[in-house]
């Protein structure tokens, strides 16, 4: 497998244990030969969907053609609490896929991990072009999407998620999509919200809750062995997740081929955010007056996988430059804004659209993490003026605008 802009193959590969019928231990490695383990993998295959696209990807891989795989999601996809991160489920899946279906050790498989902790699909749709297509140098052939524990109260109410799925399926390369429904340790996620989207487009669904909840309840799998905290798997849990995705791939690989079907004409949530474009301070051709937001914030959220800043071309008000407004004039239908919540002296900014106050955004109380809000949501494109300034009494506080995402 050829990673794209990611570290080299991990050096800590878990040893294969002797199969056992006893529950897992903290040092255990997944053992597919054991009945309860295989039953868990079988349960993870929530919905097989239409297999035509995935079969095409598998055939490309086997024939030696280049196959580009991308994963997009939150911290679980990023590899949080896997040590090292290359033992996270996303990288492990790409590794296993490359070994099983690629040629010459998977040299024809390229992979990009676009997970960022604490982020919803509304930020994913902003980042797709940069962090998936540009990172790979091509559109993905296989796209794995995971936002199940991050999309609670998501700004677009599911439309960004469906837009991402539809955008990938609409590519000229007949790309395949796999939805991964991760789960918190309390067995909560938003899979009931996203599952209808899978049905509408015939997308395979791997449901981790369906897999592990019965195993935990029956004492076959220790919850504290699978989960490292409330949200994130251990190395062992990440490897189980990767095995669940591989189970889906193997099931569809051996199934009778489906006929490729045209994309559904009617959306479930909405496709308003297909083709979303990112705006940051390096973007040209957008009318922006930075006002007092002229600094660059260096204390920002990073990609754990690459240790690179997630939004380096930001606009920061540092509390010492006055209170001149940030102004942007833009022709758009939809506009998303991504701002930072940080520790220390961060304050509240007011956001105006066409002179009307639409948001009060508190930039304090976070860990440099991203927060996405929807500022404009229209059916037709029109010229809008967006103005951002510190709230009264907050002029000496800091506030950082990470980026915007818009549709034309």
Predicted regions and their residues:
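Ser/Thr-rich, Proline-interspersed low-complexity disordered segments
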Residues: 2-31
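Serine-esterase "nucleophile elbow" of acetyl-processing enzymes
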Residues: 31-114, 129-138, 327, 335-337, ...
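Short, conserved micro-motifs enriched in small and acidic residues
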Residues: 83-84, 232, 274
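Alpha-helical cap/lid subdomain in secreted, periplasmic
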Residues: 94-108, 119, 123-261, 317-321, ...
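Glycan-recognition and processing domains
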Residues: 254-329, 338
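Contiguous, non-catalytic segments that form substrate-binding/exosite surfaces or channel walls
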Residues: 332
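Extended, polar beta-sheet/loop recognition surfaces of beta-rich domains
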Residues: 395-408
């Amino acid at each position: 497998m050829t990673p794209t802009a990611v570290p080299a193959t991990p050096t800590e590969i878990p040893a294969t244990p002797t199969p056992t019928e006893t529950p897992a231990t903290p040092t255990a490695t997944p053992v597919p030969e054991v009945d309860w383990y295989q039953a868990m993998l079988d349960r993870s295959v929530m919905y097989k969907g239409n297999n035509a696209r995935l079969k095409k990807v598998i055939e490309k891989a086997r024939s030696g053609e280049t196959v580009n795989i991308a994963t997009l999601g939150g911290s679980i996809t990023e590899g949080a609490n896997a040590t090292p991160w290359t033992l996270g489920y996303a990288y492990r899946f790409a590794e296993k896929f490359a070994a099983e279906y690629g040629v010459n050790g998977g040299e024809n498989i390229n992979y990009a991990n676009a997970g960022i902790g604490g982020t919803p699909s509304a930020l994913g749709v902003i980042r797709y072009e940069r962090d998936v297509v540009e990172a790979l140098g091509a559109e993905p052939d296989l796209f794995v999407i995971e936002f199940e524990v991050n999309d609670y109260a998501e700004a677009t109410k599911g439309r960004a998620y469906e837009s991402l799925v539809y955008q990938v399926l609409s590519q000229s390369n007949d790309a395949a999509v796999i939805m991964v429904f991760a789960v918190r340790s309390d067995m909560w996620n938003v899979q009931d919200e996203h599952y209808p989207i899978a049905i509408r487009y015939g997308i395979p669904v791997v449901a981790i809750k369906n897999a592990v909840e019965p195993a935990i309840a029956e004492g076959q799998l220790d919850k504290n062995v699978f989960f490292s905290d409330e949200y994130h798997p251990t190395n062992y849990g990440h490897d189980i997740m990767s095995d669940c995705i591989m189970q889906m791939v193997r099931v569809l690989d051996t199934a009778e081929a489906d006929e490729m079907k045209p994309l559904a004409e009617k959306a479930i949530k909405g496709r308003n955010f297909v083709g979303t474009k990112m705006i940051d301070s390096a973007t040209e051709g957008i009318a922006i007056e930075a006002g007092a937001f002229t600094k660059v914030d260096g204390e920002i959220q990073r990609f754990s996988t690459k240790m690179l800043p997630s939004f380096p071309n930001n606009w920061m008000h540092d509390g010492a430059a006055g209170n001149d407004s940030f102004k942007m004039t833009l022709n758009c239908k939809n506009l998303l804004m991504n701002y930072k919540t940080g520790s220390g002296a961060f304050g509240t900014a007011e956001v105006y659209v066409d002179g009307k106050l639409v948001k009060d955004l508190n930039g304090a109380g976070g860990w440099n993490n991203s927060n996405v809000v929807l500022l404009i949501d229209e059916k037709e494109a029109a010229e809008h003026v967006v103005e951002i300034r510190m709230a009264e009494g907050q002029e000496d506080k800091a506030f950082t605008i990470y980026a915007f995402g818009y549709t034309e």
